[in-house]
UniProtKB/Swiss-Prot annotation:
InterPro entries: NusB-like_sf, NusB_fam, NusB_RsmB_TIM44. It comes from Aliivibrio salmonicida (strain LFI1238). The gene is nusB. It comes from the Bacteria. PANTHER family: ANTITERMINATION NUSB DOMAIN-CONTAINING PROTEIN (PTHR11078:SF3), N UTILIZATION SUBSTANCE PROTEIN B-RELATED (PTHR11078). One of its GO terms (biological process) is transcription antitermination. Keywords: RNA-binding, Transcription, Transcription antitermination, Transcription regulation. The keyword Transcription applies. GO terms for molecular function: RNA binding. The keyword Transport does not apply. This is Transcription antitermination protein NusB. GO terms for cellular component: cytosol. Involved in transcription antitermination. Required for transcription of ribosomal RNA (rRNA) genes. Binds specifically to the boxA antiterminator sequence of the ribosomal RNA (rrn) operons. Belongs to the NusB family. Gene3D superfamilies: NusB-like (1.10.940.10).
C-alpha cells in the first residue's frame, strides 16, 4: 500500500460507515444501493452547511475502509451479533439501532482489522457514540467492547 492513511481519514470512514450501517438496518435496503447513495451524495449536495462536514472521498476519507466496514458488517451481521451477545446486559432486540450499528461495526473491526489496535477501536466507538447515539450510550458501548476485546483479539 505504501501510502499511510491519516487517522482523520479513518475516523471519517468510520463515521460514514456507521451512518450507512444504521441506514441499512432501518431501511433493509440493498447494501450496494446504500453504498452508492453515500458515495455520490457529496457530488450533488454542496450546500453551505455541508462545507464544514467531511466528504466521502479521498484523501479526506479512507473510502476503502468505509467500504470494508460497511460491507463487512452487512455480510456478517448475524455472526457479529453472536459475538456480542454474551457481553450485552440486555437482549439484542432491545438495543437502540445506533448502538447496534456501532457495536456491529466495532466488533467487525476488532475481528478483521489487526492493523488497528483494539484500544483505538474502542476509543473511536466511544467518540462516535457521544456524537450519534443516546446520551449515555458511550458508557454502554465502552463496557461491551471492553469485555469483548480479550476474546476477539489475542493481543
Amino acid at each position: 500500500m505504501g501510502v499511510s492513511v491519516k487517522p482523520a481519514a479513518r475516523r471519517n470512514a468510520r463515521q460514514f460507515a456507521l451512518q450507512a450501517i444504521y441506514s441499512w438496518q432501518i431501511s433493509k435496503e440493498n447494501v450496494a444501493a446504500i453504498e452508492e447513495q453515500f458515495l455520490t451524495a457529496d457530488k450533488y449536495d454542496e450546500e453551505e452547511h455541508h462545507a464544514k462536514e467531511p466528504k466521502l472521498q479521498a484523501p479526506e476519507t479512507d473510502v476503502a475502509y468505509f467500504r470494508d466496514l460497511f460491507s463487512g458488517v452487512a455480510l456478517n451481521h448475524i455472526k457479529l451479533d453472536g459475538k456480542m451477545r454474551p457481553y450485552l446486559s440486555r437482549p439484542l432486540q432491545d438495543l437502540d439501532q445506533m448502538e447496534l450499528a456501532l457495536l456491529r461495526m466495532s466488533i467487525y473491526e476488532m475481528m478483521n482489522r489487526d492493523d488497528v489496535p483494539y484500544k483505538v477501536v474502542i476509543n473511536e466507538a466511544i467518540e462516535l457514540a457521544k456524537v450519534f447515539a443516546a446520551e449515555d450510550s458511550h458508557k454502554f458501548v465502552n463496557g461491551v467492547l471492553d469485555k469483548a476485546a480479550p476474546t476477539l483479539r489475542k493481543k
